[in-house]
Amino acid sequence: MTTFSCVMVGNESLLVECAKVLVQRGHQIRTIASRNADIIAWAGTVGIPVVAPGAGLEARLTPGFDWLFSIANLSVLPEAVLSMATKGAVNFHDGPLPRYAGLNAPVWAL
């Protein structure tokens, strides 16, 4: 399997579950951008640096990662951040977009 490097952005527990899968499969998470205390604590236990999301995020990230994963993230990421990923950016949202954008998407989809 070919491994890759990534940056993850988000503030929900789904980010940690996805990150665990990536780590188990040998992929490198370079940085997590989050304000969530549980995510920050988990990242600390596995040695992944955490930065604050928001304005100026591109200045807090080190260029050269393959993928950017935005997971259950409610903020729009600027082009300056999206373009840092050499292979692309993926938005993981737990409901069909754009019809069920926003909060509680799984419930609305039902």
Predicted feature residues:
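One-carbon transfer enzymes
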Residues: M1-L110
